[in-house]
Amino acid sequence: MKFSFAALASAMLLTSTAAFAGIVTSSSNIDFLAIDGQKANKDLLKSTKSFNINESQTHQVVVRVSEIVRHGSDRSLYESDPIVVTFQGTNEDVVISAPKLENERDIKNFKDSPSVIVKTNSGRIIATKQEILKQEGFLPGANLIDTLSEYNASGSVASVSSFATAMPAVALGFTKAQKGKVVVQGENIAEQQLQFWFQQADKETQVRFLNWAKNQK
């Protein structure tokens, strides 16, 4: 009888916890770089590129806005600086979205005032604190989590002190490429960046990239 009561209590607790959880997704032009102080890897993101939040917690996500933008008759890839977004969790599902960027004017306007919108599926705008995550050095994205940890310890606008000492994603078993030493060689920055990101990718992505590169000859 005691076992049955304990099992029932546990089930009720799990049900209650689940009832207060929402799911966060994003518009197609947003990538999640970090979630609550940790690298946004497969351990944190679902196959649908979403993650759970809890209404009793403050959550923080680092996002990047990416768009293929027209420049006259040409097109190029625009990628924003990382944006730190902090907000209170909710039991509703949430969408983080950025405006559509189609041309140079849109890019300029976004650079002048980079921000995203956090909105529930019911249409309620969630209050946020946002700030660009400043990065330095060669391939600054490689040290994103360290930079974010320092940011969270700084007391800045969108910082969350409890995430300042978050365990690095490498310790969670992120990818083989990140566990080992990444070595880049090349005569220019572009070549070195290609080598770096190739080593960060999983095997399937590397194969697709190599097949794509062969077709560019």
UniProtKB/Swiss-Prot annotation:
It comes from the Bacteria. It holds the Pfam family DUF2057. Keywords: Signal. This is UPF0319 protein HS_1349. Residues 1-21 form the signal peptide. Belongs to the UPF0319 family. It comes from Histophilus somni (strain 129Pt) (Haemophilus somnus).
